[in-house]
């Protein structure tokens, strides 16, 4: 039996998420609720824990209270075997300053690396929706002999300009790392596809520490993992690509195998929710062999009374639909939809209240939003733009705790 290497996980969770405003007005992007029972960070933590990586540092900064509380309440490990998932806010160990970039966040947290003394470090982002077995990527990294391995997902070349792109040779060595290029490179085996960076990296520890320290002395650097550290290691010939399509997750269906979504905009966030609601969803939340763990509350089951109806929808615990209709929507816990109301193609976060006869279409309602009797949202976008945020795709977004 192959012995397991000593691996430390670092999750970069300090993102502000400006493009998700107003959902990030009061919380860090990784703390944004998703899918009726989760927060965005639950996907990366579930992937790491399912793979057996149980020593994880979550680097936080921007409005981190919700995130810190969620980790402490939802992600408690036994600790008997040195297991931990711990949020790490900026410690100001190098002076009176906060993190200036993702690489600087790791620089300021190198004491954690020295304490753990791992052979390898996985550095993953905290705000994507996907399933992945990181252990397979770690083994690929070890076998490649590279200093860093970058996870790449194949996207159509015509769409790749929106991503950090990887140009690699047939051996998997990265020859260029390009940030949102006008002319993305093809993959070695398909000129019509491009490797887009998933923001997930595996490092040999010494390579990461040396690169982080060298970057800290460069006054021209933005101290960013994708923008500075990876390009420097590519130039040094130390980087390889890991093809995400080779990652085999137990229980994955043909339909959702290889699913990965960057939900950094309101439209992308909305579209990812719509991926969940069909009979055969593009992303299956119900894979018991690779579960996504989320908040567990002591709530009663959802209830449908007086003809309340939900079609093609995800409905969380504690919801009550009373003579109301919900279609193609995702309802988080404790949502109440009153008589005669209609909710279509919408995302309702915990504690939302929809009044009698109200209509909500193509909208995202943050926690504890109250929609009054007879209110109409998502039908007249010109009117909605005067009151709320409306995305380029016409999705109405209403911030936390708003009464309408």
Swiss-Prot record:
The catalytic activity of this protein is classed by the Enzyme Commission as: 2.7.7.27
Q: What CDD domains does this protein's entry cite? A: ADP_Glucose_PP, LbH_G1P_AT_C
Which PROSITE patterns does the record associate with it? ADP_GLC_PYROPHOSPH_1, ADP_GLC_PYROPHOSPH_2, ADP_GLC_PYROPHOSPH_3
**Catalyzed reaction equations:** alpha-D-glucose 1-phosphate + ATP + H(+) = ADP-alpha-D-glucose + diphosphate
A biological process (GO) of this protein is: glycogen biosynthetic process
- Which positions bind alpha-D-glucose 1-phosphate? 99, 164, 179-180, 197
Involved pathway(s): Glycan biosynthesis; glycogen biosynthesis
Under NCBIfam families, the record lists: glgC, PRK00725.1, PRK00844.1
Q: What does this protein do?
A: Involved in the biosynthesis of ADP-glucose, a building block required for the elongation reactions to produce glycogen. Catalyzes the reaction between ATP and alpha-D-glucose 1-phosphate (G1P) to produce pyrophosphate and ADP-Glc.
Q: How does it assemble?
A: Homotetramer.
What is the recorded name of this protein? Glucose-1-phosphate adenylyltransferase
Species, as recorded? Rhodococcus opacus (strain B4)
Its organism's taxonomic lineage begins at: Bacteria, Bacillati, Actinomycetota, Actinomycetes, Mycobacteriales
Q: In the UniProt record, what gene is named as encoding this protein?
A: glgC
């Amino acid at each position: 039996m192959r012995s397991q290497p000593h691996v430390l996980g670092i999750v970069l969770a300090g993102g502000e998420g400006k493009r998700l405003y107003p959902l990030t007005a009061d919380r860090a992007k990784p703390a944004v609720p998703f899918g009726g029972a989760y927060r965005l960070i639950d996907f990366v933590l579930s992937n790491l824990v399912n793979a057996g990586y149980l020593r994880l540092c979550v680097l936080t900064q921007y409005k981190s209270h919700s995130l810190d509380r969620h980790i402490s309440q939802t992600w408690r490990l036994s600790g008997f075997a040195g297991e931990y998932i711990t949020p790490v806010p900026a410690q100001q160990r190098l002076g009176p300053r906060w993190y200036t970039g993702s690489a600087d966040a790791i620089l300021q947290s190198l004491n954690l690396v020295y304490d753990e003394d791992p052979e390898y470090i996985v550095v993953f982002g905290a705000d994507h929706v996907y399933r992945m077995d990181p252990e397979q990527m770690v083994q690929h990294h070890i076998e490649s002999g590279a200093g860093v391995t970058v996870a790449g997902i194949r996207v159509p070349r015509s769409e790749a300009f929106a991503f950090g792109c990887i140009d690699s040779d047939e051996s998997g060595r990265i020859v260029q790392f390009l940030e949102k290029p006008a002319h993305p490179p093809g993959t070695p085996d398909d000129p019509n596809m491009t490797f887009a960076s998933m923001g997930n990296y595996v490092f040999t520890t010494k390579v990461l520490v040396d690169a982080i320290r060298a970057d800290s002395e460069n006054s021209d650097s933005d101290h960013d993992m994708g923008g500075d550290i990876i390009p420097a290691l590519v130039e040094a010939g130390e980087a390889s690509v890991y093809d995400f399509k080779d990652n085999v997750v137990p229980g994955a269906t043909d339909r959702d195998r290889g699913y990965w979504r960057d939900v950094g905009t309101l439209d992308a966030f909305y579209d990812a929710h719509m991926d969940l609601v069909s009979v055969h969803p593009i992303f299956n939340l119900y894979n018991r062999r690779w579960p996504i763990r989320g908040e567990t509350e002591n709530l009663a089951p959802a209830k449908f009374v007086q003809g309340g109806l939900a079609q093609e929808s995800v409905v969380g615990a504690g919801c009550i639909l009373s003579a109301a209709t919900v279609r193609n929507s995702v309802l988080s816990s404790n949502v109440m939809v009153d008589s005669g109301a209609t909710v279509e193609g919408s995302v309702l976060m915990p504690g939302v209240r929809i009044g009698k006869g109200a209509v909500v279409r193509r909208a995202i309602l943050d926690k504890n939003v109250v929609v009054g009797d007879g209110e109409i949202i998502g039908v007249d976008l010109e009117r909605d733009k005067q009151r709320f945020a409306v995305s380029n795709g016409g999705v109405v977004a209403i911030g936390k705790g708003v009464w309408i």
